[in-house]
């Protein structure tokens, strides 16, 4: 009996598939990252899109006296705490885009996955990725731009060593919260620490996610740039109550989908294309200079030969 006759005796796979339903995933976007900075920052709501940071002028000159001994009659010093007359104000910045969806597509092809919902989901994910990039690299309000000269140090020998990170911790020694660096920076530090016989501990956070740590401070990878084989390590203290770094957002937006994020339907044009405006308002404030420090010119291309 020929193979053709065998095939004709039963329904074939190709024909049978025409009656079967396939399980379909939602669209997968490879540029989505964990965005640890957005998770680890403390977020503060602001009014009218403005956040004013009031600082004390010459804090070391505030005079307080401790009594030297019993019966001392030395005069009590007079003092007052002066404030900056022109404090820095942070204004929320917007990240926006228009999403176009043909009504025919959303009407006919929204099962099992809603086309409008998926278009907006992927757009919002991309906007949040851009938000994190700006929080680190923006020349106006990014972490790297707000680190002062006194809070920026150089590596001892190019590659990031435990001594380098210890020196960075001395700059943000009041309850530091976390490090930020590029994945290549994490790998470079792991090599140097292991080569010196002190491999960095690994802890589990946010479920199964593994983080390299140093002195208990987390090292999540992030959008810190790498240029010419060099990157940076950023150390941050977070929170208003700790005079640290805080993220800023505007609450109560029209069409709010998440803190500081709104989606608004703007209409349908003559080509039957529906348009949605997606906008995120964000910024980042450093309350005191010692809440942020940067290890600069970190080489990520140095390797060791183990014998």
From Swiss-Prot:
It is found in: Encapsulin nanocompartment. InterPro entries: Encap_f2a, SrpI-like. Keywords: Encapsulin nanocompartment. Signal peptide: none annotated. One of its GO terms (cellular component) is encapsulin nanocompartment. Pfam families: SrpI-like (PF19307). Homooligomeric. The encapsulin nanocompartment is formed by 60 subunits; monomers form pentamers which assemble to form shells. There are 12 charged pores where the pentamers meet as well as 3-fold axis channels and dimer channels. Belongs to the encapsulin family. Family 2A subfamily. Dominant antigen for this bacteria, could possibly used in vaccine formulation and/or for diagnosis. Has 4 domains; an N-terminal arm not found in the type 1 subfamily, a discontinuous peripheral domain (P), an elongated loop (E) and the discontinuous axial domain (A). Shell component of a type 2A encapsulin nanocompartment. Forms encapsulin nanocompartments about 24 nm in diameter from 60 monomers. Probably encapsulates at least cysteine desulfurase (CyD) and allows passage of cysteine into its interior, probably involved in sulfur metabolism. This is Type 2A encapsulin shell protein. It comes from Mycobacterium avium. The lineage of its organism: Bacteria, Bacillati, Actinomycetota, Actinomycetes, Mycobacteriales. The gene is enc.
């Amino acid at each position: 009996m020929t193979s053709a006759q065998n095939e004709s005796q039963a329904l074939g796979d190709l024909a049978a598939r025409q009656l079967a339903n396939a399980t379909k995933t939602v669209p997968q976007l490879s540029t989505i990252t964990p965005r640890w900075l957005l998770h680890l920052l403390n977020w503060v709501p602001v009014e009218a899109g403005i956040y004013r940071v009031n600082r004390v002028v010459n804090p070391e000159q505030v005079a307080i006296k401790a009594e030297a001994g019993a019966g001392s009659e030395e005069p009590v010093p007079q003092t007052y705490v002066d404030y900056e007359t022109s404090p820095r104000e942070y204004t929320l910045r917007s990240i926006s885009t228009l999403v176009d969806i043909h009504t025919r597509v959303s009407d006919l092809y929204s099962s099992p996955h809603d086309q409008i919902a998926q278009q907006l989901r992927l757009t919002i994910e991309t906007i949040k990725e851009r938000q994190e990039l700006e929080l680190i690299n923006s020349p106006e309000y990014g972490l790297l731009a707000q680190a002062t000269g006194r809070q920026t140090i150089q590596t001892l020998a190019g590659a990031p060593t435990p001594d380098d990170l210890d020196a960075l911790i001395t700059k943000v020694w009041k309850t530091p919260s976390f490090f930020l660096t590029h994945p290549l920076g994490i790998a470079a530090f792991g090599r140097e620490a292991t080569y010196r016989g002190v491999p960095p501990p690994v802890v589990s956070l946010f479920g199964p996610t593994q983080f390299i740590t140093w002195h208990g401070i987390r090292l999540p990878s992030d959008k810190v740039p790498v240029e010419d084989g060099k990157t940076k390590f950023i150390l941050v203290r977070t929170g208003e109550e700790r005079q640290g770094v805080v993220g800023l957002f505007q609450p109560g937006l029209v069409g709010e989908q998440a803190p500081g994020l709104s989606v608004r339907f703007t209409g349908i044009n003559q080509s039957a294309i529906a348009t949605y405006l997606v906008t995120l308002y964000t910024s980042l404030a450093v309350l005191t200079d010692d809440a942020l420090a940067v290890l600069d010119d970190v080489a990520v291309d140095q390797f060791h030969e183990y014998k």
